[in-house]
Every structure is written in C-alpha cells, then in structure tokens.
C-alpha cells in the first residue's frame, strides 16, 4: 500500500491469544502468550502508521481478558489489562493516544459463557466475584505534518 494513503483505520485486533480465528498457525490468534502476540503486532503496527494519512485517526477495538486461576496458578480469576497494553504498544510505534470509548457489553451473556459470576459461586464466597468486562475503542492519531494547528494534512471538514 502507498504511504499516507488511508483516511481512517478502524479495526478489531485479535485479543492476544484469546481467540483462534483459523487453524493456520501463522494466524495472529495462535500465540503462546501476550508477549508473543505483541511481537507479531510489532510487524503490523508500523505499517498501519505508514499508510495512515498525517493527522488522521486509528480506532482500535479491544477488550480486557479474563485469566482463569486454573491456568495462571493464582486459583482465582484475574483481569489482564489488554487495553492498557495496547495503548502502550501503539504509542511505542508513534501513534498519539487521545481517547477511549467504552462499549458496554452484556454481562449476563458473558456470565453464561464463563460461569464465573454465578449465584452458586456468590453463595460460596462473595469475595471471589468479579465484574463483567466492557470493550473499548482506543483512539489514536498520526501526527500531522504541521503541528502548529493540529489539523490533519487533509482535513475532514463539514460542508
């Protein structure tokens, strides 16, 4: 793709190794851990910055991940702050972070999939209970060529 040719990037990246999108082991979803995932993203993210027009927006959809205690060895569910890791990752590659939109999700549906917030667990020990995880749209900009006004090189103007 040509440099500085894309007006908007809006994508939902894989959430580390949370989902497998295909059986292909070269797929972004096939990673041993979050560190390996971001090693793969280190190849993609500079390309996103390169093709985005100066001053334009990249909107990245992410979600924090529930880590189950039987997998982590803690014995209790914890939350991996994946959205915070993504903010650091994109900033490391030159994107300017300027906001986050919270996407409220259906906690009942999430509970039905994981059984971690159920009444039976509450009755055993309420201190174990967590909360449902919302999703986020992280907002980044590529710096414009002229930084004195913060306007994009090709402005998005209302007519």
Q: Can you say where each PLM-predicted feature lies in the sequence?
A:
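Core catalytic lobe of class I
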Residues: 1-159
